[in-house]
From Swiss-Prot:
Transmembrane segments: none annotated. The keyword Glycoprotein does not apply. Residues 1-335 are annotated as: Uridylyltransferase. This is Bifunctional uridylyltransferase/uridylyl-removing enzyme. SMART domains: HDc. Its EC number is 2.7.7.59, 3.1.4.-. Modifies, by uridylylation and deuridylylation, the PII regulatory proteins (GlnB and homologs), in response to the nitrogen status of the cell that GlnD senses through the glutamine level. Under low glutamine levels, catalyzes the conversion of the PII proteins and UTP to PII-UMP and PPi, while under higher glutamine levels, GlnD hydrolyzes PII-UMP to PII and UMP (deuridylylation). Thus, controls uridylylation state and activity of the PII proteins, and plays an important role in the regulation of nitrogen fixation and metabolism. The lineage of its organism: Bacteria, Pseudomonadati, Pseudomonadota, Gammaproteobacteria, Methylococcales.
Length: 877
């Protein structure tokens, strides 16, 4: 007779079986991970993992359902059904249940699923009858796709066959309807990744050019025919042998990365995050002089791989579109010229030997597309021919005057320049025609600043320049639109854009090397001497305007005069301004903001005025101070402020103040200070609509220790980014502090609640006296922690000998400016001005400083002491 002891023995036996199954899974996972590290091909490991889970599920089924059951079936679907199970992939199951099955069967299935959870499989599952499957699949493309890859594991074959019959293309989701749905799905998926494969932390599975692109090809062809794998695509004439090999190699590479991510993280991780890139690069055997070079080499191979997958995905889907959706359509070719014809609004070579017999047609095809806006693209067979004949673009081709003429014609067209350069890049023609460009295709820079590969960034620069020409985008940057109308030969700007980063990754300064490449390009393309000089100059100096605007004091007339001497004339300034704005906006769209736009426009306007005045006329400080006072006084009188009130404020402020602020800002400050009683200090005001493309925070307070450090600590805690800081000490012991700030999103703070919150928090903190600032509790982002920058301090001389210019390079982190302020206070340093710049994870800040007596730090001992304290406070984190 059974009793409590018997029940406990049964429970212990069941527990032991569960524990044993868990141990088997863990052992299999560890064994496959180890074999992966020792070089076993990933395809073998995936097959073995799939077979192992198949066997495990069959055992569990036998225990809970019984192999002889005819009213139920277990089907693997999704990636598992496809036989592509990685270490931590989802185990997706469909359980088919006969409508006539006894009610007890549902309990059996519940026990079966509970067992799977107990042993750690965590399956995704659905339980349906064949009729329910068909009904659900009729309106849900995800379900029909899963069923398409279904694989019977155990149970009733008749039930599974009924599902296959009920969901056949004749009954639902014809191959044409399925194709259109999958194309729409891919467009949505691509948009989630900004329609580019070139993301710094790409998704290996879902991103453009990832494994999902390969799977989508298989789904569409399988719905249309009896093809089961990629190999069948060759037999059915969809792929050539070479394309099949390229696709298989890409799949193996992406599988390898995804398998490594699963092994490394112990979970289903498909994102190639910064956290893993360096480790995977080492694991895959990449080498380089620096750790960054190792990662960049690995990621360049990744980006080139996914670009190839994207290209093959596009080719195959277009082939399918032509062969299936338009199979019965009668389109008569329309001749375009001797080499091409139009078929259904797509360009097609008139015969397969066109490119072999007329190699220049490899460039001509893109020019024809530009000149015929009704053409939607190139037919798939012709794309394939282009790829097969790229080897014809050799040195003789590149030096052929007719080839050079065709390429320049492409750049000179009034429309389609960006589209066709992108198409040339996709098909591999641009890299073949410009081999130096080919070396930067897929090349990333391992930082948070450059969010695109070099080739993608370059084509975005061209796109931005093209937008400046179009009235529909005039409001994006009115000055750029206005200036572009003055450009006589826009193609020179496009050439400079193509060349400005073409030498990235080469030995030496990429601007200097790029200048030499640009000179050779101009010689080969018969560009005139004057135009060649302009292109060379733009490539060599493409960074000078952004560096000046973001790192130097634009209120200093000498800075403007020096920049004007570099530029020399208005035409060069116009070209450089357009190239600079296009370049910055194409580097990292999230880092472009109204502040940077205002800085560049201020530099452009000031330089234009200096050029009109004449480079031989030295800056006149007294004249500019007098002009600023006159304009500000006119505004103040309009506001009704008495002359004696104006004088009372201004006589306590040095002349330097009138150089560093605009007349409108001077008038605003003066009005506020004149109305402020001492008992109301600290005075904290916000100007939401600053002339500098940001919110200005103005503080008037008694000068004391930690004032800058306290203020920046509070601004940091409030989630504000400081872009610029000016500190003026009055003759009566007061300090005027002006900060230009934006939200971390790059937008200006707005809304009454937010503006009042900023003022109140600052007043509260500054009313507490001269105590050291509180520690900033905000944490650094996950990404920044992977890009530490060694702290470096440099000193530069001020041409006017008013300040010492301190340059701090460090890892950007919460509370950085507050720590700098504390270091200045410790060493008796007076801060007058600060230019704050963040390049990804790298802070590049410029401080204009003096000692307590307002003298520059000339002595090496003083500079060394300050450097030592700064590094102590800022440190390397």
């Amino acid at each position: 007779m059974d009793g409590p002891n018997s029940d406990r023995a049964h429970d212990r036996h069941a527990f032991d079986r569960v524990a044993a199954c868990k141990a088997r899974i863990q052992h299999n996972t560890a064994e496959l991970a180890e074999r992966f590290r020792t070089g076993t091909p990933v395809a073998d490991l995936i097959r073995e993992r799939t077979a192992f889970i198949d066997h495990l599920l069959s055992e569990a089924w036998d225990r809970r359902i019984g192999r002889g059951a005819t009213d139920v079936a277990l089907v693997a679907v999704g990636g598992y059904g496809r036989g592509e199970l990685l270490l931590h992939s989802d185990v997706d199951l469909l359980i088919l249940l006969d409508e006539a099955a006894p009610s007890s069967r549902k309990q059996d299935l519940s026990d079966f699923l509970r067992l799977l959870w107990d042993i750690g499989l965590k399956p995704g599952h659905s339980v349906r009858s064949p009729a329910e499957c068909a009904e659900a699949a009729r309106t849900d493309q995800t379900i029909i796709t899963n069923l398409l890859e279904g694989r019977l594991l155990v149970g009733s074959a008749a039930l599974w066959e009924a599902v296959r019959s009920e969901t056949a293309p004749e009954r639902m989701w014809s191959s044409a309807a399925f194709f259109e749905a999958k194309m729409a799905e891919q467009r949505i998926r691509y948009s989630k990744y900004h329609n580019t494969a070139y993301n710094l932390e790409p998704n290996v599975k879902e991103g453009p050019g990832g494994l999902r692109d390969i799977q989508l090809i298989g789904w569409i062809i399988r719905r249309h025919s009896d093809a089961r794998g990629l190999q069948d695509l060759v037999a059915h004439g969809w792929l050539t042998d070479a394309e099949y090999r390229e696709l298989k190699e890409a799949q193996a590479f992406l599988w390898r990365i995804r398998f490594a991510l699963h092994a490394l993280t112990g979970r289903c991780e498909d994102r190639l995050l910064f956290d893993y890139q360096r480790e995977l690069a080492g694991l895959f055997g990449y080498r380089g002089e620096t750790s960054n070079e190792v990662v960049e080499g690995f990621m360049q191979d990744y980006f080139r791989t996914v670009t190839g997958v994207e290209r093959l995905n596009e080719l195959l889907l277009q082939l399918f579109n032509e062969a299936v959706l338009h199979r019965d359509d009668a389109f008569s070719p329309t001749p375009v010229n001797d080499h091409f014809q139009a078929v259904n609004d797509y360009l097609e070579a008139v015969h397969p030997a066109v490119f072999r017999e007329h190699p220049l047609a490899l460039l001509e095809v893109f020019l024809i597309l530009q000149k015929n806006s009704a053409l939607e693209g190139v037919r798939a067979a012709t794309i394939r021919l282009i790829r097969q004949h790229i080897h014809l673009i050799d040195d003789a081709f590149r030096n052929d005057p007719e080839a050079c003429r065709l390429f320049m014609d492409i750049l000179r067209q009034p429309g389609g320049v960006t589209h066709q350069l992108r198409r040339m890049n996709r098909y591999g023609v641009l890299a073949a025609y410009l081999p130096e460009f080919g070396r930067v295709v897929g090349r990333m820079q391992y930082d948070l600043f450059h969010v695109y590969t070099v080739d993608e960034h370059t084509l975005f620069v061209v796109r931005n320049l093209r937008r400046f020409a179009l009235e529909e985008f005039q409001q994006e940057n009115p000055l750029c639109y206005e200036l572009f109308q003055l450009i006589e030969k826009p193609e020179l700007l496009y050439i400079a854009a193509l060349m400005h980063d073409i030498a990235k990754g080469s030995d030496g300064d990429h601007s200097e090397v790029g200048e030499r490449i640009a000179e050779e390009f101009c010689r080969r393309h018969r560009i005139g001497p004057r135009e060649t000089l302009l292109v060379k100059w733009l490539v060599r100096h493409h960074l000078v305007m952004s560096m000046t605007a973001q790192r130097k004091d634009l209120s200093d007339p000498e800075v403007i005069h020096e920049f004007a001497q570099i530029v020399r004339n208005q035409n060069t300034l116009n070209h450089l301004y357009l190239l600079t704005v296009a370049d910055i906006r194409a580097t990292n769209p999230s880092l472009w903001n109204s502040w940077k736009g205002a800085l560049l426009q201020e530099l452009y306007t000031s330089t234009s005025w200096t050029l009109r005045r004449g480079l031989d006329t030295p800056p006149d400080y007294a004249e500019q101070i007098s002009a600023a006072k006159d304009e500000a006084r006119t505004l103040l009188q309009r506001f009704g402020l008495a002359e004696d009130a104006i004088t009372a404020v201004w006589e306590n402020i040095g002349d330097d103040y009138f150089l560093r602020f605009l007349p409108e800002e001077i008038a605003w400050h003066t009005t506020a200070i004149a109305a402020c009683r001492p008992e109301h200090l600290p005075l904290v005001l916000l100007r939401p609509e600053s002339l500098r493309g940001s919110v200005e925070v103005f503080i008037y307070e008694r000068n004391r220790d930690f004032l800058f450090a306290q203020t920046t600590a509070v601004l940091d805690q409030l989630g504000l980014t400081v872009l610029d800081a000016k500190i003026i000490a009055s003759r009566q012991g007061f300090a005027l502090l002006s900060f230009n700030v934006l939200e971390r999103s790059g937008t200006a703070p707005e809304g009454l609640f937010r503006l009042v919150q900023i003022c109140d928090r600052l007043k509260e903190a500054l009313s507490g006296g001269g105590a050291p600032p509180p520690a900033v509790s905000r944490l650094a982002t996950r990404q920044i922690r992977h890009f530490t920058v060694p702290t470096k301090v440099f000193f530069h001389d001020d041409p006017q000998n008013r300040f010492s210019i301190l340059e701090l390079i460090a890892t950007d982190r919460p509370g950085l400016l507050s720590k700098v302020g504390q270091a200045f206070m410790r060493t008796g340093i007076r801060l007058h001005n600060a230019k704050i710049s963040t390049v990804g994870s790298r802070a590049e800040d410029i401080f204009f400083i003096t000692d307590r007596e307002d003298r520059p730090l000339d002595g090496e001992a003083d500079r060394a002491a300050l450097r030592r304290v700064l590094i102590e406070f800022v440190g390397d984190q």
